[in-house]
């Protein structure tokens, strides 16, 4: 047995091997040490007879019926677990029982419900990068979702954005991707996912064949991948990894979704985090995020669909309006919406249920849940009949899965056991054979009595009895006192005693075998019938998946309508105008966290022409960041098809939303706050377009005043300039000198958050008004924050001193054109460089680098 273990273990050296021995999964050697440490299991040994403890084989084990709990703990810690089962019956096995690994469980290949988060997809990813071509593929094997994205050029930001969007638990890479360091660093540090090397799995022809076979394609062109060889390699490598770990049919992975430009908005990591789309920046939890506000879904698949919609805002006004029209109908019909929500509330996770059915890991309870889901479908279709919107009409045409409901309802008892191998799953009447065996098992004594009576009549021996003992089993006892009677020819003598003879007949032997093996036969037959039923249901995987997807969409639409009613949202007008007009907008998350204070709504108006850039000034803590974030969130909410927290809103679709809000030192990568800020600014200016929305908060604050002011102005002017960018931009700053740009830079306007002083106190009014703020009230904010009075008093003294010095004739004046003086005009080298530079040809990053170079030269 040890040799068998070592042979199997050698094939799965990167896994913890769960080796089936009877009712336990055992681990040996180093696996045992790891499992003992990680699972708090007692470490024992099989060979206690060995004198030297160091030579003994360490081992530990877990019961097979509760192994999922232990496996889940190991997977959560990043381990891979190989399940090695007995693949033949130990009773009939000749010699050593055959064993083999039937499945490898990894963080990205989990299907067991106890290891999965209901409202969150569990993605496995693959990345391919070579010769400037990059692609990524993602699959949630618990549901069958399979997505592919391809990117052109050497810029890795797109693939990083997709990694951030899907957040895979596990990622496989080819050598080229691993050598970038950018991809593995992002995956490990930002996502915390397990990394695997793909080896030779990315060879194009093999990958193309694998993709075609899996999705039933005659050629790669049918999937839209004819011009995307990198995507084919990523998808093929992912399919191979799934096949190697799952070792079973993947029939539920049947549709490939190609992420192409023009469908979904791309969101970078910084934007996703700073806007707190799915988790709070402070706690990392769902509470405090946009997802938390919008998630009134009632089904697990609806929860995952909502998360996907938030992560994938739409770019097509037509597709957005399709969702909004459906939400509007549900919003207006409280009765139907309430009944739909009540019906959805009792539905289980159809997507993952059908996945387990296909994989062969479903149990009786799973089928009962699937049956109950199917039972609710006719009512949902009935409730949707009056609606006219295209999306709700489409959903109402879902397959009600009547055949699946009928088959499960006929076969499976209402309260089946958890295990499918212990019997008790099938209803009476489903199988005559099972019913007969159950009757024998439950009425064995009656069967024996009936045979005994039958034999008495047949033989005429009134004292004939049928008895049983553990040595001889069942026997017919004929007392010698019965006299000279004729013993039937089919009676076979088993034992002779002093006063009686014991016989058996073929019929009695068959009854004995039946009685003694009835339970085992029942278990095997019920298991076989159950697996046959699962196979029949699995053949309808396409219908179940389509219905589950429709229910998930309906769940999200109902949630949007319910949130809109509860929170007083309005239906936005979405178009391609480039306008962004929000009346009395509110921050969707902040307003839900305020208990006794009413949220102060504010207007926003931006467009692609005369009102492109809004400079927002005002005190710290007054709400500048909240105001800008709410504008971004309202825009994103509209583009996922949700109503928005405002009195009215016109949202011209934006292609990207970028944010540069707040920062903290990235010590792990050696980046300071300022360096991180500049990296993010460079990324924004490199990828934004005139159709983007930019949210920039206090650019340049991480360096000296004049350096920061210079950078802030340069960035702001670049954003405003139609020839360079011309994007809709909200720009919060404490550099009040930038207010002078209104009127001198086309498209720039000043706004401020009002505040007023009452004695020594500062009152935040939270209202956005036209014009620049006249003061930052920094000292007043310091006082509000609890800075000691002596420090505040000293600060006021210094402030008066600095203001007096600034007003003095000796104070250095800015240049006449109000341009910020970056360098001493007498610095010849700096002047020469400036005169010879074509500023209009510089990229944002080149401009920042040039600015840094000039600063160093000016300082000597």
Identify what each model region corresponds to.
Residues 29, 228, 298, 307-309, ...:
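ATPase nucleotide-binding head domains, primarily ABC-like/P-loop NTPase cores
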Residues 3-7, 14, 534, 552, ...:
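Conserved phosphate-binding elements of NTP-dependent enzyme cores
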Residues 359, 363, 376, 393, ...:
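Charged, surface-exposed helical/loop "interaction arms" that form contiguous linear patches used
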Residues 497-535:
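Extended, charged coiled-coil "arm/hinge" scaffolds of SMC/Rad50-like chromosome-maintenance ATPases
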Residues 1-329, 338, 345-358, 362-453, ...:
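Charged catalytic and DNA/RNA-contacting regions of genome-maintenance
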Residues 321, 378, 438-441, 445, ...:
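Alpha-helical coiled-coil heptad-repeat register
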Residues 363, 853, 857-859:
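Short, small/acidic-rich helices and loops at N termini and domain boundaries
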């Amino acid at each position: 047995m040890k040799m068998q273990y070592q042979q199997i273990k050698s094939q799965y050296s990167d896994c913890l091997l769960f080796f089936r021995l009877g009712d336990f999964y055992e681990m040996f050697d180093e696996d045992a040490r790891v499992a003992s440490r990680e699972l708090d299991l007692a470490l024992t040994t099989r060979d206690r007879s060995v004198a030297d403890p160091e030579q003994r084989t360490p081992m530990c084990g877990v019961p097979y019926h509760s192994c999922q709990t232990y496996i889940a703990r190991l997977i959560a810690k990043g381990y891979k677990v190989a399940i090695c089962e007995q693949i033949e019956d130990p009773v009939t096995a000749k010699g050593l029982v055959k064993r083999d690994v039937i499945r490898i469980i990894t963080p990205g290949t989990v299907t067991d419900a106890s290891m999965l988060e209901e409202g969150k997809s569990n993605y496995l990813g693959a990345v391919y990068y070579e010769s400037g071509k990059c692609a990524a593929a993602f699959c949630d094997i618990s549901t069958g979702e399979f997505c592919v994205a391809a990117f052109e050029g050497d810029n890795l930001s797109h693939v990083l954005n997709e990694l951030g969007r899907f957040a895979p638990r596990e990622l496989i890479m080819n050598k080229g991707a691993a050598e970038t360091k950018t991809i593995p660093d992002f995956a490990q540090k930002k996502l915390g996912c397990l990394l695997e090397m793909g080896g030779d799995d990315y060879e194009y022809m093999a990958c193309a064949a694998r993709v075609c076979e899996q999705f039933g394609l005659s050629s790669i062109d049918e999937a839209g991948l004819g011009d995307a060889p990198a995507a084919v390699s990523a998808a093929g490598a992912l399919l191979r990894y799934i096949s190697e770990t799952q070792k079973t049919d993947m029939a539920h992975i049947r549709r490939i979704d190609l992420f192409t430009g023009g469908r979904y908005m791309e969101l970078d990591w910084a934007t996703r985090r700073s806007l707190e789309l799915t988790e709070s920046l402070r706690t990392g939890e769902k509470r405090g995020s946009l997802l938390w506000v919008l998630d009134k879904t009632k089904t697990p698949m609806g929860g995952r669909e909502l998360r996907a919609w938030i992560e994938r805002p739409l770019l097509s006004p037509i597709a957005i309006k399709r969702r909004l029209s459906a939400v509007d109908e549900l919003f207006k019909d409280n009765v139907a919406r309430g009944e739909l929500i009540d019906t959805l509330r009792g539905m289980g996770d159809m997507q993952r249920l059908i996945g387990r059915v296909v994989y062969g890991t479903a149990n009786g309870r799973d089928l009962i849940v699937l049956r109950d889901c199917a039972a609710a479908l006719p009512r949902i279709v009935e409730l949707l009949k009056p609606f006219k919107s295209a999306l709700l009409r489409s959903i109402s045409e879902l397959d009600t899965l009547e055949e699946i409901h009928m088959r499960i309802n006929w076969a499976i008892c209402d309260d089946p056991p958890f295990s499918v191998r212990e019997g008790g799953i099938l209803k009476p009447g489903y199988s005559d054979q099972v019913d007969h065996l159950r009757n024998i098992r439950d009425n064995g004594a009656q069967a024996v009595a009936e045979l005994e009576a039958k034999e008495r009549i047949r033989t005429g021996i009134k004292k004939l009895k049928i008895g049983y003992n553990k040595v001889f089993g069942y026997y017919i006892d004929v007392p010698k006192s019965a006299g000279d009677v004729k013993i039937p020819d089919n009676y076979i003598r088993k034992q002779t005693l002093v006063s009686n003879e014991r016989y058996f007949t073929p019929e009695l032997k068959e009854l004995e075998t039946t009685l003694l093996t009835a339970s085992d036969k029942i278990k095997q037959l019920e298991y076989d019938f159950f697996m046959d039923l699962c196979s029949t249901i699995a053949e309808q995987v396409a219908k179940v998946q389509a219905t589950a997807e429709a229910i998930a969409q309906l769940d999200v639409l109902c949630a949007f309508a319910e949130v809109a009613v509860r929170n007083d949202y309005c239906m936005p007008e979405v178009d391609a105008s480039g306008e962004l007009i929000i009346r009395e907008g509110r921050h969707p998350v902040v307003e839900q966290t305020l208990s006794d204070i009413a949220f102060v709504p504010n207007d926003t108006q931006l467009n692609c022409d005369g009102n492109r850039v809004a400079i927002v000034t005002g005190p710290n803590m007054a709400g500048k960041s909240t105001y800008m974030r709410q504008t971004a969130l309202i825009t994103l909410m509209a583009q996922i098809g949700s109503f928005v927290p405002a009195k009215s809103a016109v949202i011209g679709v934006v292609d990207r939303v970028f944010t540069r809000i707040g920062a903290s030192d990235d010590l792990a990568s050696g980046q300071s706050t300022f360096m991180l800020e500049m990296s993010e600014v460079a990324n924004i200016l490199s990828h934004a377009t005139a159709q983007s929305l930019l949210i920039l908060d206090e650019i340049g604050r991480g360096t000296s005043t004049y350096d920061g002011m210079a950078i802030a102005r340069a960035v702001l002017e670049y954003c405003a300039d139609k020839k360079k960018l011309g994007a809709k931009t909200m720009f919060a700053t404490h550099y009040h000198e930038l207010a002078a740009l209104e009127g001198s830079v086309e498209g720039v306007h000043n706004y401020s958050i009002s505040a007023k002083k009452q004695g020594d106190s500062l009152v935040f009014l939270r209202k956005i008004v036209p014009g620049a703020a006249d003061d930052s009230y920094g000292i007043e904010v310091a006082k509000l924050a609890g800075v000691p009075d002596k420090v505040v008093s000293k600060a006021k003294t210094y402030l008066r001193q600095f203001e007096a010095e600034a007003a003095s004739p000796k104070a250095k004046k800015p240049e006449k054109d109000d341009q910020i003086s970056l360098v001493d005009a007498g610095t010849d080298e700096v002047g020469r460089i400036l005169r010879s530079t074509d500023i209009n040809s510089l990229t944002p990053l080149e401009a920042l680098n040039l600015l840094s170079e000039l600063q160093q030269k000016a300082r000597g």
